[in-house]
Swiss-Prot record:
TM stretches of this protein: none
The protein, known as: Probable exo-1,4-beta-xylosidase bxlB
Main location: secreted
Key words of the record: Carbohydrate metabolism, Glycoprotein, Glycosidase, Hydrolase, Polysaccharide degradation, Secreted, Signal, Xylan degradation
Annotated source species: Aspergillus oryzae (strain ATCC 42149 / RIB 40)
Catalytic activity from the UniProt record: Hydrolysis of (1->4)-beta-D-xylans, to remove successive D-xylose residues from the non-reducing termini
Entry's Gene Ontology BP terms: arabinan catabolic process; xylan catabolic process
Amino acid sequence: MPLICIVYFLQYLDKIAISYASVTGLRESANLHGNQFNWVSTSTESIFPDCSTGPLSKNNVCDTSLDPVSRAKSLVAAMTLEEKINNTKYDSSGAPRLGLPAYNWWNEALHGVAEGHGVSFSDSGNFSYATSFPMPILLGAAFDDDLVKQVATVISTEARAFANGGHAGLDYWTPNINPFRDPRWGRGQETPGEDPLHLSRYVYHLVDGLQDGIGPERPKVVATCKHFAAYDLENWEGIERYAFDAVVSPQDLSEYYLPSFKTCTRDAKVDAVMCSYNSLNGIPTCADRWLLQTLLREHWGWEQTGHWVTGDCGAIDNIYADHHYVADGAHAAAAALNAGTDLDCGSVFPEYLGSALQQGLYNNQTLNNALIRLYSSLVKLGYFDPADDQPYRSIGWNEVFTPAAEELAHKATVEGIVMLKNDGTLPLKSNGTVAIIGPFANATTQLQGNYEGPPKYIRTLIWAAVHNGYKVKFSQGTDINSNSSAGFAEAISAAKEADTVIYAGGIDNTIEKESQDRTTIVWPGNQLDLIEQLSDLEKPLIVVQFGGGQVDDSSLLANAGVGALLWAGYPSQAGGAAVFDILTGKSAPAGRLPVTQYPASYVDEVPMTDMTLRPGSNNPGRTYRWYDKAVLPFGFGLHYTTFNVSWNHAEYGPYNTDSVASGTTNAPVDTELFDTFSITVTNTGNVASDYIALLFLTADGVGPEPYPIKTLVGYSRAKGIEPGQSQQVKLDVSVGSVARTAENGDLVLYPGSYKLEVDVGQDFPTATFTVSGKEKVLDEFPEPQQNATSAVTRRGR
């Protein structure tokens, strides 16, 4: 008997609390704070040391009148060599002799407090769930810096509550700010997109929200920018991240792979950085003194109190076991420590630092410095302070999953959803019967992506349809990556009995994830076959595409039987409800693609291992700056209304390189304001809507060849523009955004003629400006090492 579930709800449904229901086998919305999803739970106790009566109280680390470095030095000075080495691992053992408890540095909070490692969730009751926001790729599609900070602020509050409740540590290994360079990358979902300016602004506001300010003396939690650097390959065609050598030119490194990290460390003053699995130009990043010392700490000035570097988990082992950069564990431990890695998310440091010291591969002060950096961070976090003296120690369970947090998770999801096609099918008519078909039709945890924790509930598409007054016919039809058509007949039967058909599919973490890249960028399995058959029914058909990476939508865009197409990423707890807000017109779509949607053939034109951005004989170019044959371009997104854009001035300036490069503040000159460009955005349609103004710069003939097609230099999200109304939108452009990167990696302001354009796929007016004078170097890029020998002597090779 075919499984076609028809859901009827009585009028009193809304009067009762249902968060997990089974109606003829149909889940509407999963309540996750129970045992059924098998989240790990551990017994907990306070993570904080006893600085009042215990043996640690006699150490100056507990003296709140001293500065963090002095306090940390006092603690480290009291440790034996064995105790020091035992505390260089992520799950540090502490020092019972001193009254120093164990501490787990490995905590995750990519889009909400995430289960595992240092973070535990209870089976029920307090600390059994946390707010689950959309994955960064969908949050990035909102192009809303204020929203990013608001989300990060809630995450840090809940993270601090978990720490205060004994369920987590105080530092979190987030965010992932590697640019989404290749569409096959399995972890692109963890990033806000492909553009370095967008990533930089995202991370600045995220760190601001997570740490509660820019370089605060007392951070709420510690954020960790990862993975430093040029990391964006998992396991492609048998090439694994653990042994991959990313060969990157100084120009591409400075221009594309590093800006988000520069912003994170130099400007946002994050407290921690994670070095990555890969090698960079022959040197494992966690053993790369140029990367961790010359560039990071010296050139970017990231030497403030309590700033530390952790290796990715197992990365120090990879130095010798996979990269074969040194002969053994002792040399790998010394190479990483000497380069500036302070903490090992692995076992090489505790196992081999003793032997390495005996061999004279590093000195004791280098070890002390690493520990001082780590414990200075904990001092800043108030780890050793009385609870009454700490502004964040009072944060508790009552500040987790608040109504405001629920509302924000919903808002963030709605803002990010992108409409890729609409022939008038949307918004949906109210009421009636909808058939919801596909592998995401009744998805719950599948909507979360990765690095997730259990929320209180997850709203499915079916739950949302019912709560919007629709009768629902449900059939999965097929799986994400199946070639079986056994469920097609059931799906077609359900669709025939409905007024409207919604197909919910795409890709999930069985297709893309950490340790798993894609080899194709097509819709997997036979999903397109089922969509094709549904489209032949000549009923209104909407496709909702889930997943972090894009798939080639060419056939759906060309199919007249597909009336509308939405991309919803990984929307997490508010997923179904937010999607239906867009489908029904309760909210107007305004998100923009944060990545390029490439044609399926792209993967045959360039290997993932080619890190080059610019087009060449064996590379068609990467990202919207260098590739112009996209199925859908970076920044694409449709609305329920129409807009017109006009410039306040057709020509700006003039500008001179001397005056622009001289700066007006003590901030790095590349961060200073070049100018604020104003446009007028008018809603010429019939639906109130947000509008994301994307400002691109073109300058053929300016700077080194080849010239980028265009470059994003600013953006702003205008909120709630009513029909017939206009808003003035101001777009701040920094000096660094106008500059270009020379072949040696220097950031240079070039004289010449420049053109500004707004949006993609529109024929809006443009504006121009001219920069006169001589070339001005804004930032001299430190000369990278090339295939250098290790920081310790290589042996046995």
